[in-house]
UniProtKB/Swiss-Prot annotation:
Organism: Aspergillus terreus (strain NIH 2624 / FGSC A1156)
SMART domains: Rtt106 (SM01287)
SUPFAM superfamilies: PH domain-like
Gene (UniProt): rtt106
Protein name per UniProt: Histone chaperone rtt106
Annotated spans, Disordered: 67-99, 368-468
Length: 468
């Protein structure tokens, strides 16, 4: 009898083949459900624990199902996952404007079959609504507005040649407020995304309309770039479209894929991400991959160089949000040494190497609103010439101040001396340093006379020699 009792106690209890709570929690995960049952079979004493885990999982699934909208169905235009990246289609990060963004409105301009690269990579219809409303992109199959931005919230618009393409193309980059990669929205809102689309050189190939007048593709003779540029400049109120300028920067290396054409870009890396730098009249762009970064002059604290080697160098940009806060450091690496002199000239022209001028740049807030292209170009030229002289003056004063505060005097410097005589006297001291004490005393007297002459300048000629 005792033998039978011992043997029966050694037999493990039967594992339930189905537990309702586990079946419900892992209904969509059969492989995970099987692993749970296998674990229960090995350790049946933990059945209550697995049931508690299953109940908690079911509650999480129910909570998520009620708090989120149902996922969009995949269509011929792309998977639903990509669509959900743009929350409700508004890249400006302002949900209150969604109704207006997608509402039917009179169009100032539209162009079909435009190749967008950001925030989605697909062909869409570009639209600009009348009255300075919205710039938006519409799906050509479903006719739904995919994304857009209020025109009044556009901070920068750039028109740049696409690098390293056999056929000439232009990228239009629309950067919303707080979407430049440096400034961020208040209140923890998601940063808006930039909008980038490409147009080929030459007349538009697809139908477009301006102020309700339809134009067939290829008609009119005006290039697609000029058409879009004109429409945007007419619609924009706070800025104008910025293009590369020979007076700002031209790469030392011509465009590799289009012989005889100037290149306005410089290849660089940010971490492992390859991109292109454009040095423009209002700031520096790093693109064209997500996320775009635009360093407006008013956001740049200073620019310096690191890892200057025989073939490459790095560019370090300290940038600060317009609202203030701590500066952020951005390192752009592996820049070709051939472009060093051109980049250095650009940086010095705009005083970007000098952190002491950062407040002045922020106060200036480069603004070309309301100017024609010709007037803006002339004004920018005059401002640059005037700014150069002021920057050079500030730089000289800063260098003189540093020389005065330096403890160890450097005979090779151009700054003020500590009473050791002029540069010619210093050379004499080096050559005659082993002469007797009388020669040293004579040289000290000459040094004192030269110091007086240096301090008084032209007035020293009016003082009798015996009084010097």
């Amino acid at each position: 009898m005792a033998f039978a009792t011992i043997n029966s106690s050694a037999i493990p209890p039967a594992t339930p083949s189905s537990i309702p709570t586990i079946e419900h929690a892992f209904a969509s995960e059969p492989s995970l459900r099987k692993r749970v049952y296998d674990a229960i079979g090995a350790t049946p004493q933990y059945i209550p624990l697995f049931e508690d885990i299953a109940r908690y999982t079911s509650s999480l699934l129910a909570r998520n199902a009620t708090s989120t909208a149902p996922p969009a169905e995949a269509s011929a235009d792309g998977p639903a996952a990509k669509k959900r990246k743009i929350q409700n289609g508004d890249v400006s990060g302002t949900p209150q404007s969604l109704g207006d963004l997608k509402a039917d409105a009179e169009l100032q301009f539209h162009m079909r079959d435009v190749s967008f690269a950001m925030p989605q990579r697909k062909k869409l219809t570009l639209e600009v609504t009348a009255g300075g409303g919205f710039l938006r992109a519409r799906n050509q199959t479903s006719k739904e507005v995919e994304f857009g931005v209020p025109v009044e919230k556009i901070q920068h618009v750039l028109c740049l040649p696409v690098p390293e393409k056999n056929q000439r193309q232009f990228n239009f980059c629309v950067i919303p407020q707080n979407g430049d990669g440096i400034n961020t929205p208040a209140g923890g809102e998601a940063a808006p995304e930039s909008i980038v689309w490409t147009v080929a050189d030459g007349p538009p190939k697809s139908e477009f309309s301006i102020n309700g007048q339809a134009v067939a593709g290829g008609a009119g003779g005006e290039s697609a770039e000029k058409v879009v540029l004109r429409v945007l400049n007419d619609a924009l109120t706070q800025t104008k479209v910025i293009r590369p300028d020979d007076r700002e920067f031209v790469s030392a290396m011509p465009e590799a894929h289009r012989k005889g054409e100037k290149a306005y870009h410089v290849k660089a890396f940010r971490g492992s991400k390859e991109g292109y730098l454009f040095f423009l009249s209002t700031g520096i762009l790093f693109g064209f991959k997500k996320p775009l970064i635009f360093f407006a002059f008013e956001n740049i604290d200073s620019v310096s160089y690191t890892s200057v080697l025989q073939r490459t160098f790095n560019l370090n940009i300290m940038a600060r949000a317009t609202a203030g806060g701590e500066p952020q450091e951005f390192e752009l690496s592996m820049i070709d040494q051939a472009d060093f002199s051109g980049i250095d000239a650009y940086i010095k022209t705009h005083g970007l190497q000098d952190a002491s001028l950062a407040e002045e740049r922020r106060a200036k807030r480069y603004n070309i609103n309301g100017k024609t292209e010709e007037a803006a170009a002339a004004a920018n030229g005059d401002e640059t010439a005037e700014e150069e002289s002021e920057l050079q003056k500030a730089q000289r004063e800063l260098e003189d101040q540093e020389d005065e505060e330096e403890e160890d005097y450097d005979p090779g410097s151009d700054g003020d001396s500590d009473g050791s005589g002029s540069s010619s006297d210093d050379d004499d001291d080096d050559d005659d340093e082993h002469q007797d004490d009388e020669d040293d005393m004579d040289e000290d007297e000459d040094g004192e006379q030269d110091l007086v002459a240096a301090e008084l300048g032209s007035q020293a000629a009016d003082i009798p020699e015996d009084q010097v």
